[in-house]
């Protein structure tokens, strides 16, 4: 997703910024094969500009998206309140939680699945979960996230990074609501679509809160929505995702 956003920005006037992103995951991609990104100029307007981007691998579209860009302008304002959650300094990091789980299960770090090994960013979940013992949980999750400060101030890069981050764990709230996760036997779990809206100019140097909830899981699909807040409570972005949650019989 981040790469398609950057590709679209290469065709956009510098006065415009991405405010709306809608995408579909069409086919599985192969990390060992190259991907070609094609950008279609759908509309160039004074206030709004639209681009369609397609990711093609071995002659087939594996992903496509539509992105709307807007010139910044003043207008009426309102936003929802940030959830009342503990400050990040009072919480354990994902790494600390992982090490506790490893010690409890007497596992080596090398035995941990790739998806739950240490990330390059720091994440401190408000609600803890044991990946190896999934159980039904309330359909929401809150996580404080912080980068190492190395992300450029360039808004294109900051938006692309936040779009990338937004895909981490978004479907997890829907999985939690039915007591499964990516380690569950016979579970087929995959993103089907992803949408994101950028509300403000970004500054991702410090902590920000990713608050996710899942209104419904049904018909082998889970639906989740996320709100991303700066530490001082400003809503900087929103996102939604529907994903496949298909549990095959033995």
List each model region and its residues.
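Terminal targeting signals and extreme-terminal segments of soluble enzymes
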Residues: 1-250
């Amino acid at each position: 997703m981040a790469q398609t956003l950057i590709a679209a920005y290469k065709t956009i006037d510098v006065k415009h910024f991405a405010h709306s992103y809608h995408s579909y995951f069409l086919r599985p991609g192969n990390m060992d094969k190259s991907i070609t990104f094609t950008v279609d100029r759908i509309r160039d307007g004074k206030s709004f500009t639209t681009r369609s981007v397609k990711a093609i691998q071995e002659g087939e579209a594996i992903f496509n998206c539509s992105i709307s860009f807007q010139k910044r302008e003043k207008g009426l304002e309102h936003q929802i309140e940030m959830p009342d959650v503990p400050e990040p300094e009072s919480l354990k990091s994902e790494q600390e939680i992982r090490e506790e789980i490893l010690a409890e299960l007497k596992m080596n770090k090398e035995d941990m699945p790739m998806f739950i090994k240490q990330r390059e960013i720091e994440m401190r979940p408000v609600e803890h979960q044991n990946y190896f013992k999934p159980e039904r949980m309330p359909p929401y999750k809150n996580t404080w996230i912080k980068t190492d400060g190395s992300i450029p101030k360039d808004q294109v890069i900051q938006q692309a990074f936040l779009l990338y981050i937004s895909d981490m764990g978004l479907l997890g709230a829907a999985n939690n609501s039915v007591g499964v996760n990516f380690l569950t036997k016979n579970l087929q779990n995959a993103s089907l679509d992803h949408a994101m809206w950028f509300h403000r100019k970004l500054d991702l140097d410090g902590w920000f809160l990713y608050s996710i909830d899942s209104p419904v899981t049904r018909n082998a699909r889970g639906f989740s929505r996320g709100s991303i807040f700066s530490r001082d409570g400003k809503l900087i972005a929103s996102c939604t995702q529907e994903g496949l949650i298909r549990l095959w019989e033995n």
